[in-house]
Amino acid sequence: MSQLRLLLFRLGPQARKLLATRDIAAFGGRRRSSGPPTTIPRSRGGVSPSYVEEMYFAWLENPQSVHKSWDNFFQRATKEASVGPAQPQPPAVIQESRASVSSCTKTSKLVEDHLAVQSLIRAYQIRGHHVAQLDPLGILDADLDSFVPSDLITTIDKLAFYDLQEADLDKEFRLPTTTFIGGSENTLSLREIIRRLESTYCQHIGLEFMFINDVEQCQWIRQKFETPGVMKFSIEEKRTLLARLVRSMRFEDFLARKWSSEKRFGLEGCEVMIPALKTIIDKSSEMGVENVILGMPHRGRLNVLANVIRKDLEQIFCQFDPKLEAADEGSGDVKYHLGMYHERINRVTNRNITLSLVANPSHLEAVDPVVQGKTKAEQFYRGDAQGRKVMSILVHGDAAFAGQGVVYETFHLSDLPSYTTNGTVHVVVNNQIGFTTDPRMARSSPYPTDVARVVNAPIFHVNADDPEAVIYVCSVAAEWRNTFNKDVVVDLVCYRRRGHNEMDEPMFTQPLMYKQIHKQVPVLKKYADKLIAEGTVTLQEFEEEIAKYDRICEEAYGRSKDKKILHIKHWLDSPWPGFFNVDGEPKSMTYPTTGIPEDTLSHIGNVASSVPLEDFKIHTGLSRILRGRADMTKKRTVDWALAEYMAFGSLLKEGIHVRLSGQDVERGTFSHRHHVLHDQDVDRRTCVPMNHLWPDQAPYTVCNSSLSEYGVLGFELGYAMASPNALVLWEAQFGDFHNTAQCIIDQFISTGQAKWVRHNGIVLLLPHGMEGMGPEHSSARPERFLQMSNDDSDAYPVFTEDFEVSQLYDCNWIVVNCSTPASYFHVLRRQVLLPFRKPLIVFTPKSLLRHPDAKSSFDQMVSGTSFQRMIPEDGPAAQSPERVERLIFCTGKVYYDLVKERSSQGLEKQVAITRLEQISPFPFDLIMREAEKYSGAELVWCQEEHKNMGYYDYISPRFMTLLGHSRPIWYVGREPAAAPATGNKNTHLVSLRKFLDTAFNLKAFEGKTF
């Protein structure tokens, strides 16, 4: 190889000259023969070194195997390469060499010039976007850097970078296969090459795509943008674009005239976003998409609702009326946060299309994973594995796109098998400012869109004051998504004509920018003048279009005054047809029984302890676990993992789709679940026995997630939005880690129904328990969930027949801490069998997963049984309640510590222990019954958490309300602390010992006042 490289180094020009002759098989032939080929394939790519190497090695092996011209060339080349400069040469050879050198010099120059042109073309493809004219204001460079790459020919003197001269500008050069600027031509002059490259890469569109590591995808983009004449629009397309711009701009103008002092976060400065979104939807509809799910922030949201989703204008305008009364319970939300669902005909394609705009909070980008989850679910229920029928569009602000970490988390879900939505079109409203923050202070990367490079998503920057460029880019983006099932980003470089909101004064912080903005001609006028000048429309037609839309707005404004009541349910983004009655209420308020037939339990247990596939070798340790499950099934008992298996399996039998997601959920953080079996002999061969229960069962999805909480929990929340007939669960690796998803919990799960009248049945499984494992592996922070529960601690409830189910219907979420596998089984089934949906927070155990006493009998799970909100004392103390001196209430794992300690002290008759399985809504009725039963006993709340954490601050005032402050509820547990747990095992055991001693010291509270 080194010999060949030396040879080519010395005689490269001759080799290229030889390749260029028509009697040699050119690059692309790839055919060896004893004679010249009958047809000679030509290539615009020039010389292929690999082809020369191929010929050379073939010649070394057998000189007769190559064409005679190659044989002559290699013989001469080898001979000349072996002659050193110090060796004497015969006069004839010297004369021949001089002629050869002269020829070589010319050939070398020609080849080098062609190579320079190829490098030049590649330079524009890679770096042309840096000098594209993207800022409508002409103030900023879109990449925040005024540096011009030295390999772009922005001035004549730059030709020297490639060792080219001005005289070369009119020379013809063969174009490589990696460009389409020639169209049908194979050669162009250097001047024309530069002109076409400038036109493609350095005008109002800046393309970032050369980092993509797929040649086909790069070629596809090059062809879409480099081919001459691709951006030509018909008269009808231009008129449609103008009409859409009219609607976009006049809508904002109308709001500004009618409600000049109201916040609306208008779209002025980026009015082109409306035709941009409509183009993406039109093109996608043309390619077969039937359902588009959108997520976006507040900027321009009302305009999107009006002109993209096509919400009735009077429904939007009436929201500006301060006297409008809310018909729905709950807080409601501001108008620029509300969602929408609408089915209509797409006028361009004449096809049905469903558009959903997902409601979102002010927390920027938080809606991104929610939209992706909802999209994934809609694709799943339609059987749309390739994303041909359902797609998502996400609209972002430039500052948030660069600044919010959830954007990165969401991008990294885009190609995971259980999370991909087969491509999302991202539209960035890049108004070059974040509230008052200059982009130079808002990001370290050149562009706000650089985060998208991590998933090889192409990025199309476009000047928003060039509507035709915007529309073309959006059309290509929709095609890209349909062709490659990958994300794509459209960066609309625009400006913000007003302040962050309409009451804000931007001149305080951006005086020079806003001086320019005040001079800026609106894009509608620019484009209208252009079309009028070229004769596409007349001035009269343009004015009539404006008057027409103004009239539509005025008429809607008149109708809006008749609206006296606001129905938030009319703004629902995810309706569930047939689940509620016509008024949006549950069809019944019956509390479900959640037990199942014993033969179903046995069947699920047998499948859970087997391997349904033949010749599937599992790990020996797993064989032991499966044998244990089989043994429990025979004995009619279940542990925690088997109870979960039976809950899931029974729901699958009833046609309920189950999806479990989170970090390491397939095996389980604590190696207890093992829902996915792995063949020990065949790499990546897996088996999910849960999908082999019944022939006609619903599908079960269990999937390890990326190491993300915020993004993945948001995704699962969105997934649960799509249908009520599914059990969607997210499990934290440890309950402590849920707080990195706190935004989703606070803004969507806890408050979603109150703000947006949106039911959601998502389940959070949060491993929790004080076991001496340190402050980050102990607490799921139950106090936070209970603090956000909306039941009134001071309101004494009325105990009606349907009190239990009414409590559940009125709450914002359900919080449980199950102490038995049976309770866990029932609460999971109840979650789906209730006639409505509420989020369920489950504090799940760790050590109880294998605790010998933490088992349940089939008798507690068979037909006729149901979830017990409270499990009362059933031992000797319950037989003689009048003799009981202390009644301890507790929840979760600490129950087993208390029972063990009570037994060791022989206090079974003096101390009763009652467990709360459901903490919120608080089981007032059951607590009252238990307190009355032990009327002479001292009441104690015992928890293993610290006093300022856990449950005490929640249960204490409710006990007081229930008991009329007549009996105190004493606290037993750990002292207040800053950290949730200790990392020192000895300290943990000492504190455990201390509160257990207090719990069973019957004189501990003598003389104390409550």
Curated annotation (Swiss-Prot):
Tissue localization of expression: The OGDHL-containing OGDHC complex is present in the brain, but not in the heart.
Binding site for thiamine diphosphate: R299, D398, N431, I433, Q663
Chief site of localization: mitochondrion
GO annotation terms (biological process): 2-oxoglutarate metabolic process; glycolytic process; tricarboxylic acid cycle
Any Pfam family matching the protein: Transket_pyr
Region annotated Disordered, chain positions: 28-47
Enzyme Commission no: 1.2.4.2
Residues reported in the UniProt entry to bind Mg(2+): D398, N431, I433
InterPro entries in UniProt: 2-oxogl_dehyd_N, 2oxoglutarate_DH_E1, DH_E1, KGD_C_sf, ODO-1/KGD_C, THDP-binding, Transketolase-like_Pyr-bd
Cofactor(s) demanded: thiamine diphosphate; Mg(2+)
Keywords: Calcium, Glycolysis, Magnesium, Metal-binding, Mitochondrion, Oxidoreductase, Thiamine pyrophosphate, Transit peptide
Cited function: 2-oxoglutarate dehydrogenase (E1-like) component of the 2-oxoglutarate dehydrogenase multienzyme complex (OGDHC) which mediates the decarboxylation of alpha-ketoglutarate in the tricarboxylic acid cycle. The OGDHC complex catalyzes the overall conversion of 2-oxoglutarate to succinyl-CoA and CO(2) while reducing NAD(+) to NADH. The OGDHC complex is mainly active in the mitochondrion. Involved in the inhibition of cell proliferation and in apoptosis.
Top EC class for this record: oxidoreductase
A molecular-function term among this protein's GO annotations: thiamine pyrophosphate binding
Transit peptide: 1-107
Protein name, UniProt field: 2-oxoglutarate dehydrogenase-like, mitochondrial
Mitochondrion among keywords: yes
Highest taxon listed in the record's lineage: Eukaryota
Compartments, record wording: Mitochondrion matrix
GO cellular component: mitochondrial matrix; mitochondrion; oxoglutarate dehydrogenase complex
Transmembrane segments: none
Similarity-based family: Belongs to the alpha-ketoglutarate dehydrogenase family.
Native organism: Rattus norvegicus
Subunit structure: The OGDHC complex comprises multiple copies of three catalytic enzyme components, the 2-oxoglutarate dehydrogenase (OGDH/E1), the dihydrolipoamide dehydrogenase (DLST/E2) and the dihydrolipoamide dehydrogenase (DLD/E3). OGDHL/E1-like isoenzyme may replace OGDH in the OGDHC complex in the brain. The presence of either ODGH/E1 or ODGHL/E1-like isoenzyme in the complex may depend on its tissular distribution.
